[in-house]
Swiss-Prot record:
The keyword Nucleus applies. May be involved in the polar growth of plant cells via transportation of RNAs. Keywords: Growth regulation, Nucleus, Transport. PANTHER family: AGENET DOMAIN-CONTAINING PROTEIN-RELATED, DUF724 DOMAIN-CONTAINING PROTEIN 1-RELATED. The gene is DUF1. This is DUF724 domain-containing protein 1. Disruption phenotype: No visible phenotype under normal growth conditions. Its main location: nucleus. It is found in: Nucleus.
């Protein structure tokens, strides 16, 4: 294949720092001696921007760096695969490289040697590399590529420091492994958010230490992240460590960056679990930070203070008491030795012997059922003062004196009269109730409940105080029930058979009622008993569509009742379990609404496409009709043309006959 003046050739040049690059050019003179490779020939680049402006003479190049343009037919049927040598159209030159990976959209990653680089090209910008031997074109063999963890073209993550305080991880691609001063390093190319390295989006390469490079974490499927989860969030162009602080609809989250404390609202796809690369293995990072209890995630129960029946309770001492255990034996040890000494010392000053006071022990009540006997631990009294205890002793004596009279009265009272009396009390129509009782019984739902379900059996909480006649007698032979009131109402004897009471028996102490007037204490206690079981029924009958405000109101009411000695652990526990379920259901419902809106939008789009499709079908039908008409006209025209051609041939024949007759006539002898 000869080259001559004004023909198109390819010039090998390294002026721009690129090796193995070929430029299109036009020869300005014909080689006089093809065998002399060192002779320089003048040429001009076909790309005008490469020609140096202001130069008086055109550039020259040795003849051995000139070759013909490869013919296009040599590229037919060439299939690019990993390891194929190719020429890439890059910055007005054909640069030689190796295909290392096939990408989507019919594009390829090409590795270049000098300078080291990896660039993504579409197929139309690539051609198979051919070597010119001087007489023919030869295609090199396919190279065998290495497949190590950090081989060229492998996606990795490189650590970078933000504002000198935060380490983030950027997705990059290994270009080449090098060694500097005996240390292994990598030349990497930072990728864009689409993980591509296109020519128009390419970023400069950088050299990093091997300790700053790690593989990309494997994909971990996470259905939904929870509060306080440690995650990595993709922000800007890097993965940064953070903590989930809020969960929103449509799988969006509020994340606080660990280093800067900035808050971001991101999508689920921009999060991933926090992982650590160590010793060539991925390890789980801290999954969750400790959760501080709050009203939204836990319903706190207020601790009860243990107290002996005859010792004063100061605020300082009250803070030392822990929550009463459900194990009665543990409650006996609630008071420390120091507090016991202090209490007995004060009793001696009051004239009471130390031996005559015994520690408060919890009472055990045995209740028989179908399965056997079960022990129900009782709570200790809440911080009763000496004066309160001494005031109750006369009341208890009075209650004994009046017990015979109450028994005679109960015989004449029917069960319906008792219910009417209690119903009137809860509605506040006939009896005066303390502020505490009113605040608890002021629920409209309580008034509407059947009284048969609202009058459970009441068992008062008792504290045993043993007073010996002298130091030699055995203490604690009899127990006294310390209550703020004497049980005079028939209610206390008539409601123990109620099924609702049997489901969760209660033994409240009602000690806060000592502060109320004596004539309303018992009515307040009855109201609180009715209210508790009404609230218990409400908790049991909770519906999915109940609002969170209703649950909060139930929790607050139960917490108030707990101050009076009610055991509210089970209902509060149930409410605490229902709250997150309602939140999740609300989120799902919101997601459902969003999906319905999207479906509606998609339906509108589909309808529009259907209309467009129908329009196109009408156009196609019309075009077919027009094509049929045109075909018929064409056939008619062809027919006419055929007839005319036949007529023309006839006329031509007649003309020839006339000419022959004319010649014959002219040439006839005289």
């Amino acid at each position: 294949m000869a080259i001559f003046k004004d023909c198109e050739v390819e010039i090998f040049s390294e002026e721009d720092g690129f090796r193995n690059a070929w430029y299109r050019a036009i020869l300005e003179e014909t080689p006089t001696n093809p065998t002399s490779e060192s002779k320089k020939l003048r040429f001009s680049y076909m790309t005008k921007s490469l020609n140096k402006e202001g130069s008086s003479s055109p550039p020259t190049v040795e003849q051995r760096f000139i070759r013909p343009v490869p013919p296009e037919n040599l590229y037919n049927g060439v299939v690019f695969e990993e390891g194929t040598m190719v020429d890439a159209d890059y910055k007005h030159r054909w640069r030689t490289g190796v295909v290392i990976n096939k990408m989507e959209n019919d594009s390829y990653l090409v590795l270049f040697d000098c300078p080291p680089d990896i660039i993504q090209f579409e197929t139309k910008h690539l051609r198979a590399h051919l070597d010119w031997t001087g007489s023919e074109w030869v295609q090199p063999e396919v190279r065998e590529l290495s497949k190590s963890m950090f081989s060229p073209g492998t996606l990795v993550e490189v650590s970078c420091v933000i504002d000198k305080v935060e380490v983030s991880w950027v997705t990059a691609m290994i270009v080449k492994e090098i060694e500097e001063s005996g240390e292994k390093k990598f030349i990497v190319k930072v990728c864009n958010k689409h993980l591509s390295c296109r020519v128009d989006e390419a970023k400069p390469n950088m050299t990093v230490d091997s300790c700053c490079v790690r593989p990309r974490p494997p994909l971990f499927f996470v259905e939904e992240y929870d509060l306080r989860d440690c995650v990595e969030v993709f922000h800007g162009s890097s993965w940064r460590q953070g903590v989930v602080k809020g969960v929103h609809i449509e799988k969006q989250y509020t994340v606080t960056l660990e280093a800067t404390k900035d808050k971001l609202v991101v999508k689920h796809s921009d999060l991933r679990p926090f992982k650590v690369w160590e010793d060539g293995v991925w390890h789980n990072g801290p999954q969750q930070k400790p959760v501080k209890e709050s009203p939204s995630n836990a319903i706190k129960q207020k601790p009860m203070c243990s107290s002996s029946g005859a010792r004063p309770m100061t605020p300082k001492m009250a803070t030392k008491h822990a929550r009463i255990s459900f194990n009665p034996e543990e409650n006996v040890e609630e008071l420390s030795v120091a507090e016991t000494v202090a209490a007995t010392g004060k009793l001696e000053k009051m004239g009471i012997a130390e031996e005559s006071v015994s520690c408060v022990t919890p009472l055990k009540q045995t209740e028989a059922n179908a399965e056997g006997n079960k022990l129900e631990p009782m709570r200790n009294q809440n911080c009763l003062r000496n004066d309160s205890t001494q005031q109750m002793l006369p009341e208890e004596e009075n209650s004994k004196d009046g017990s015979t009279k109450r028994k005679r009265e109960e015989k004449h009272n029917s069960a319906s009269s008792v219910m009417d009396e209690i119903d009137g009390t809860c509605n506040g129509s006939e009896s005066e109730i303390s502020n505490t009782g009113k605040s608890i019984c002021n629920n409209d739902d309580v008034d509407d409940q059947p009284l048969s379900t609202e009058l459970p059996y009441y068992q008062s909480l008792s504290v045993v105080n043993s007073f010996a006649a002298d130091a030699e007698e055995t203490p604690a032979k009899s127990a006294r029930t310390i209550s703020p009131f004497a049980k005079k109402l028939p209610f206390w004897k008539s409601y123990e058979t109620d099924e609702l009471y049997k489901s969760l028996p209660q033994s409240p102490h009602f000690s806060p009622l000592f502060k109320a007037k004596e004539d309303i204490r018992e009515w307040s206690a009855v109201g609180m008993m009715v209210t508790f079981y009404c609230l218990l029924k409400e908790v049991k009958d909770l519906q999915l569509d109940d609002s969170s405000s209703k649950l909060s109101s139930l929790s607050s009411s139960l917490a108030e009742l707990e101050k009076h000695g009610f055991n509210v652990t089970d209902p509060l526990s149930r409410i605490s379990k229902v709250l997150p379920l309602q939140d999740k259901r609300a989120k799902k419902a919101e997601e459902r609404k969003c999906l319905e809106k999207k479906i509606e939008c998609e339906e509108i789009e589909r309808k529009r496409f259907e209309e467009e499709f129908a329009d196109f079908e009408r156009i196609i039908i019309e075009k077919k009709r027009q094509a049929l008409v045109a075909k018929e006209k064409k056939e008619a025209a062809d027919k006419r043309i055929g007839e005319m051609k036949t007529c023309a041939e006839t006329i031509d024949q007649e003309i020839k006959d006339e000419e022959l007759e004319f010649q014959t006539t002219v040439s006839t002898p005289w």
